[in-house]
Amino acid sequence: MNHYQIWHAIDLFAHDHGMSCSGLAKRSGLDPTTFNKSKRASVFGQPRWPSTETISKILDATHASPQDFFKYIKDNENLK
């Protein structure tokens, strides 16, 4: 699993649940800008990864299981 795959999984997960990334963040109790592409790397270009707490909030808000979410990573494992 790489940085791109996990963020792409969040993008797809939001879309498949009928939301934008901003909508998913809000529904999860997060700042609406949490999943903005501009926040996926630091100002120095270092990748920022979503925390396990963030993933947990996504799952709770959508009533999804970890397997439901990680399927999106499995489905895009050839992406780099």
Regions found by a protein language model. Name each.
Residues 60, 67-80:
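Short, charged recognition helix plus adjacent turn
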Residues 11, 22, 26, 56, ...:
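Residues within the helices of the helix-turn-helix
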Residues 1-23:
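A short, Lys/Arg-rich alpha-helix, primarily the initiator
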Residues 43-60:
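Short, basic-rich loop-to-helix N-cap that marks the start of a DNA-contacting helix
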Residues 29-48:
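Recognition helix of helix-turn-helix/homeodomain-like DNA-binding domains
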Residues 14, 39, 73:
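DNA major-groove recognition helix of helix-turn-helix
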Residues 20, 31-34, 51, 65:
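Short coil turns linking two alpha-helices in DNA-binding domains
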Residues 15, 26, 60:
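Alpha-helical residues within the helix-turn-helix
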